């Protein structure tokens, strides 16, 4: 029951459960990277590899700007950490994106029980069926793209695959 006495909808129940589990995981987790950002209920989860030292702030800023460019500002971004499996299980994303080879290896090492394909086995920038209900996308590392023009072009070519998840794009496919 909601606080006003009316019954909760199934969507409301699920949203509350997922929000609570994500908050519990975040409180318990010792993170090596920056704080996660975005909406954990967006259905889009990016797992990024932290950059070395002060470059973390630049990577966070670049990810925020890049997501805004493809109209996915609500996508949830987290970093490689010890409770990543629990976080993925609680969020149940429809799209899971590995940003960088270390993120791809970290996801693969979780031995996710329903995974059909390993992130490390797919080409960068190509969507694949990660589980029956979730798509996966592997991207190059972002930190090198902040320093090198060729790496930047390579990152962007792969990153633009995320446009398929933008609300206008999704509506256009219906």
Name these PLM-found stretches.
Residues 1-174:
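A polyanion-binding, active-site-adjacent surface
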């Amino acid at each position: 029951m909601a606080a006003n006495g009316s019954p909760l909808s199934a969507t409301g129940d699920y949203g509350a459960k997922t929000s609570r589990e994500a908050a519990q995981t975040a409180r318990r987790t010792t993170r090596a990277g920056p704080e996660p950002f975005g909406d954990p209920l967006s259905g889009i989860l990016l797992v990024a590899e932290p950059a070395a030292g002060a470059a973390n702030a630049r990577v966070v800023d670049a990810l925020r700007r890049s997501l805004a460019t493809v109209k996915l500002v609500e996508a949830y971004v987290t970093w490689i950490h010890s409770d990543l499996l629990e976080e993925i299980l609680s969020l149940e994303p429809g799209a899971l994106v590995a940003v960088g080879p270390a993120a791809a290896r970290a996801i693969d090492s979780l031995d996710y029980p329903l995974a059909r394909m390993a992130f490390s086995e797919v080409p960068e920038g190509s969507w694949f069926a990660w589980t029956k209900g979730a798509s996966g996308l592997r991207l190059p590392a972002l930190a090198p793209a902040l320093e090198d023009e060729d790496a930047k072009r390579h990152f962007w070519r792969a990153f633009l695959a995320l446009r398929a998840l933008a609300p206008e794009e999704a509506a256009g496919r219906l």
